[in-house]
């Protein structure tokens, strides 16, 4: 299919509060937390490069819907980077165990785009925001 960077993925996440600044780039390296095989943290000394671009799409009901594009693809990158900014994902059992609004991470892969390897035509696929996430913004 070609190099991985040719595939563009865009995610939507819901966080509590008004994200400030409303757009930007998070350049904060990630590493495992202690002996955990799962949990990650920002670690400027030992972490691997991790870059996330974000932009607030909408604010409603005390929450922000945020568009996120990964420049790198580290485990839990979006979850840890948003927590690092002070805006963890709603319903994230590991980094923000607040299940008041949703019983899973409020994170959705909504757009995938790439150049078709044979026809060279641009391809784009989208998936609507799930109802449980929409309900948070009502």
Name each region found by the language model.
Residues 1-138:
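RNA pseudouridine synthases
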């Amino acid at each position: 299919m070609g190099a991985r960077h040719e595939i563009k993925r865009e995610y939507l996440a819901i966080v509590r509060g008004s994200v400030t600044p409303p757009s930007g780039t998070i350049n904060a390296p990630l590493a495992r937390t202690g002996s955990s095989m799962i949990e990650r943290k920002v670690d400027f000394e030992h972490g691997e490069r991790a870059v996330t671009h974000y932009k607030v799409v909408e604010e409603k009901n005390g929450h922000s819907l945020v568009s996120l594009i990964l420049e790198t693809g580290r485990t839990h990158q979006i979850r840890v980077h948003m927590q690092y900014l002070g805006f963890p994902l709603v319903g994230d059992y590991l980094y923000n165990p607040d299940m008041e609004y949703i019983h899973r991470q409020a994170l959705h892969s909504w757009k995938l785009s790439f150049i078709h390897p044979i026809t060279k035509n641009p391809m784009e696929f989208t998936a609507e925001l799930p109802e449980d996430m929409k309900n948070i913004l009502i």
